[in-house]
A protein has these predicted regions:
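Short acidic, glycine-rich surface-loop motifs adjacent to enzyme active sites
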Residues: 105-125
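Structural motif
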Residues: 66-68, 113-117, 148
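Local beta-strand N-terminus motif with an aromatic residue
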Residues: 7, 111-113, 144
Length: 209
């Protein structure tokens, strides 16, 4: 969660990026619902250069297309805890148009591999995703090689077709060390290798997509 000051955000960002050599290797931030909460959450935008100045977007890394979606909060906008201040319905609707354009774009169609990233899973979350009615139809035939998700705080792997998903789905683990995971994607020539490790370095998953 985003605490009360810029200093706390800078400290946390440093803590999270040092381990992946964020001073030398480009690091991309994808927010989840907890990064939307607390006093300084709006200040996060001052610390990151968002692609297209939006919290969702797409870009190429070599011949791999990365598509990032922002699910917003995990509760409806009219939930009492938000005091009428949220409008994530509009944000999700915006991304319907974005997805339609992205999936038909030359950059997407010509990509060697395609990676989808969003915080709240469309599959493997008991249907509790406010984006599902808007995005699932668009994505169910999209030729993604892998989808990377989080939110449930429990690692899971769903092979293509297991839950009606048209691509493999990996859900990252929790924030406590005994359930934490790291996902590593490595592209070599025509192969995209995906590994999931736990905090002890044990390989939980090693697949090529």
């Amino acid at each position: 969660r985003v605490r009360s000051s810029a200093a706390s955000v800078v400290y946390k960002r440093q803590e999270l990026t040092e381990g992946v050599c964020g001073d030398r290797i480009p690091t991309f931030f994808m927010r989840g619902n907890h990064e939307i909460r607390n006093a300084y959450s709006i200040g996060l935008r001052d610390h990151y250069d968002y692609v297209g100045d939006r919290t969702y977007g797409s870009f190429n890394w070599g011949d791999t297309r990365i598509v990032m979606l922002d699910c917003g909060e995990d509760k409806p906008d009219d939930h009492w805890v938000y005091y009428g201040l949220n409008d994530f319905t509009q944000l999700r609707n915006e991304q319907v148009d974005f997805l339609k354009k992205e999936l038909s774009s030359k950059e997407f169609k010509k990509a060697g591999k395609r990676v989808l990233i969003h915080h709240i899973p469309l599959y493997g979350n008991d249907g509790k995703n406010l984006c599902a009615n808007l995005w699932t139809k668009l994505l169910e035939k999209a030729p993604f090689n892998i989808s990377l998700n989080a939110h449930t705080h429990k690692y899971a792997y769903h092979p293509k077709g297991e839950l009606g998903n048209n691509y493999p789905v990996i859900i990252g683990g929790g924030y406590k060390m005994d359930g934490a995971t790291v996902m590593i994607l490595e592209k070599k020539k025509d192969e995209l290798r995906v590994k999931v490790l736990n905090a002890k370095g044990k390989i939980l998953l090693d697949i090529t997509v």
